[in-house]
């Protein structure tokens, strides 16, 4: 009897790579499985897994890859941040763009520290809500924060508020940011793990795809 092996789920159906496979200007997407260190609420750590499960091969840049999940130590704060920062630095040192997916905003903090250490201490973190207020030059390198808590309640299975942004508004803002994005954190969503979470998971997947396309566009 022939045994059939299904393809391992990956972000956007992209190839799965190791660190040593990365090349300059490649977009590396990594899962961040930690949601108990900053602005915590349970379930955010499952976002990366859910996005992989619902992903299909899309017309996304071939210059992108799924790097797997970062090693995390959520019960040992100092060890955790040291490890995550080091792993982010290793990607950035290769000249690749890094996208962290899932978890709480502690991933963004670690990513910011890594960028400061590798690229420049003055690289700012820019959010969707403040990108038009900073008056940065178009050549300014930035870290983009995509906090999915900014989604309007109608797109979420467990809304915390009614007002907010639609998926198309978030994607439009991502596409129109004029600066050079070198790293991105997508976080803040605890998707339901059954059919109730299908809408919010698909919305997050579309936003991830927009981020990857925007990074690839900026590399050329």
Positions of predicted regions on the chain:
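Acidic, His- and aromatic-enriched active-site or binding-groove loops in soluble protein domains
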Residues: 120-131
